[in-house]
């Protein structure tokens, strides 16, 4: 059964069609590149999948229990939270309890910290503390650093860590390599290759995309074409498709001129 089903989704902005009765399925293990020209509505499509905006028509069907994590294109704004707290937010309630416990320990409020320690014991929460520490290390992040002190590229690393710690069934990434240096990009590529969930990715870095995806969604003037192949094969098939369209248009123009 598909994790996500798109059933005749339609959306327009100011009479411009973004999605025109789009139907498709997203399966477990799919690693999908969402391709299209600038302004085609790729980020809007991603937000529909994330549930942050609604289509005008059609249905987005998500299998019961499926979790989705979404990394937007814009880095987070300045705030004074430390990186441990931000990553822990991805764990929901237990993340908040661990954050409060850590702050109380640092403030040496041991009696109050003991109450939170009991909650953590009851929820078997220490494993999540280890998960937070492990993913901070994986992204070379210091949990005590505040977000406001970081550049755009490092902020994206923080938000990626928060998205991945949830171990979502579906991970939506909109231009994840923006502001990153080559070392960080290569490390992220390795990480996403190892990721066992379903991935939907927007990126202008074609080399990065080619190393990861096994399927392509091509968004063109509101229409979605699905290519069941990697990025390099998609490029070949797309070129062949465009060439065939050019020949067909030329034949039509020639016939029209003769009439």
Predicted features, each with a name:
Residues 250-259:
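Short cytosolic helices in intracellular loops of multi-pass membrane proteins
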Residues 1-251:
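ABC ATP-binding cassette signature C-motif
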